[in-house]
Each structure stands twice: as structure tokens, then as C-alpha cells.
Amino acid sequence: MPARALLPRRMGHRTLASTPALWASIPCPRSELRLDLVLPSGQSFRWREQSPAHWSGVLADQVWTLTQTEEQLHCTVYRGDKSQASRPTPDELEAVRKYFQLDVTLAQLYHHWGSVDSHFQEVAQKFQGVRLLRQDPIECLFSFICSSNNNIARITGMVERLCQAFGPRLIQLDDVTYHGFPSLQALAGPEVEAHLRKLGLGYRARYVSASARAILEEQGGLAWLQQLRESSYEEAHKALCILPGVGTKVADCICLMALDKPQAVPVDVHMWHIAQRDYSWHPTTSQAKGPSPQTNKELGNFFRSLWGPYAGWAQAVLFSADLRQSRHAQEPPAKRRKGSKGPEG
């Protein structure tokens, strides 16, 4: 009887405990980065907690799992060929450092914000380690076009379906298939809008395909978007607002999270309520009941004058705290008592 061919074993998500030889670490205390506060907080929509305190997602067209101990950020990268399984290289780790902008020292920023803002000082005691990701401009732009009138869970689903439909397949881990983010060319195709509507993007489908075409046909392609990193905040914000589906809030998100504009302060209903509730701020136009282009600029200027050139980072701390407290209030009491700090160390 002929021997049965052995099927290749499917690659699975790793944990630090199960495969320590395939991980590398970056010195980074929790006070400088809290993965559980940063990755699910509405900056990027592509990270999942696949195992307790182990976050898996796509960064620079590679699939990673990240976890942390008290003083270290631990990283493992998955390559398509199992024979190439090895710990991340120094160049690969540098991509992680840049993604989390670890050259920016949070402790100094928190100290400054706390010294000028007593409310921030109070909130920050429980929400150390909130920092801004430096995302790919294309991924950030189209993710936040999907964010219009939406919540984090629904945006996450839309972005995932967008990547599955138009992004390159990278690797399968357990029963999860990971895709890279689609290119401008892939999103500019003639059938894209109709396909995205079938995937549940609604009116945002038109904005996705129209913005991709506008960048390619009217603005000069990817280089135009990337060079906005060198422009002033005001110039970059104005340029982004030309694109279909990009208003003041979405433009501020892209400026802050992809274009190196730490002073950008995205204003949504959360920040509007925080400003009124905790800072007694009111727009000069007393009739204004919520965010608008004019009031967004006014509130952004208020926070910039209070917090300084990294105002967008300070805003992210308050936003994450408000988001976490809202989720906590909605959880059943039994779940609230559970936590996933991650591996000890």
C-alpha cells in the first residue's frame, strides 16, 4: 500500500510562550506604548487580538504579531515560506519602530500636557502609553473615507472586506487569510464602486473609487500624496479636502496619522463632547450644535493653544480614555473584572 503523502501543516498564529526563538524585542516600557490602548482605538483598523494580549495585523505588506511585557515590545513576522521562519531582521524591526514613532518620548509630552492641563493630568494617570501610529498614506486615506458616519467595529469590517476584495493575498494563519492594502490602481478600476456597494460600503463606495481616480488622473499619483508629508499642515489639509469623500475631520485624521502633522486635531462628536464637558468650550457661533468645518478649526486652535505642537497626540489620549470608559460601561460586570495585561516580564 503506497505511503500517504503528508499534507503540509497549516501555519498558525504564534505566541511568545510557544515560539520564543521566532521573536525579537524592542526596549519599550508600557508607559511609552500600550498596545491594548493604541491598536483598537480607531487609528488603524487592521489589528486583531488573536490570542490574549497578542495583536496580529499587516504592516508594510508583512503580517506581524505583537505583544509586550513591562519593558519590552515583542515582535514576530510571518514569511510565506515556512523554511524561512526566523526572528525579525533589524530592518524589519526598524519598520515597527517607525510605525509606532518610538523616537518620540511620550514621558516628556505627558509631563508637558499635564503641566498645562489639570484635566489631562487626571486622565493620564490611568491612560499611559497612548501614542500615534505613522501609517501608510494610502491605507490611512481610504480607511478614513470609510469612517464617515460610522463606528470602529463597522469601519474595521469595511476595511477588511476592501482588502480581501482588492488587496494582494499575503498569508493564511489558522483560519485567517491576510491581505495587503489595495493599490491606487486596484481601487480606481471601473467595477470597484459596484463591487464595494455589494460589500456593504454604501455611499462610501463612490468616494473610494473616485478618490483613487482623482489621485491617479488629476494629482499625479502616489507621489503627490507622499509629498504632502513635506508640506505645511495647512497646505496638506487643504490639498486633501479636494478629494471626494474627504472633509475637515477626515483630512485631519490623515494629516495626524499618516502625514507627520502632530498638531492636527481631528474633531468628531466624541471630541466635541469632551471639549464642552471637560473644558467648558463653546464655539463662537452659539447656534452651532456639532462639528462643522468652521467649528472644527476653532476647536483645533483651542487645543493647539493649550497643548502645543503635539496637540493631536494629546487629543488621542483623551479620545482613547473616553472610548475605553464607554466600552467599559457597556460591558457586563463579570467581563469587566477580566483583563489581558499580556505576558509577565
UniProtKB/Swiss-Prot annotation:
One of its GO terms (cellular component) is protein-containing complex. SMART domains: ENDO3c. DNA binds at N149, R154, R204, H270, Q287. Residues 335-345 have a biased composition (Basic residues). Changing D268N: Decreases activity about 65-fold. Residues 324-345 are annotated as: Disordered. GO terms for biological process: base-excision repair; base-excision repair, AP site formation; cellular response to reactive oxygen species; depurination; depyrimidination; DNA damage response; negative regulation of double-strand break repair via single-strand annealing; nucleotide-excision repair. Changing K249Q: Loss of activity. It comes from the Eukaryota. The active site is at K249 (schiff-base intermediate with dna). Pfam families: HhH-GPD (PF00730), OGG_N (PF07934). Its main location: nucleus. Residues 324-334 have a biased composition (Basic and acidic residues). It is linked to Renal cell carcinoma: Renal cell carcinoma is a heterogeneous group of sporadic or hereditary carcinoma derived from cells of the proximal renal tubular epithelium. It is subclassified into clear cell renal carcinoma (non-papillary carcinoma), papillary renal cell carcinoma, chromophobe renal cell carcinoma, collecting duct carcinoma with medullary carcinoma of the kidney, and unclassified renal cell carcinoma. Clear cell renal cell carcinoma is the most common subtype. Belongs to the type-1 OGG1 family. This is N-glycosylase/DNA lyase.
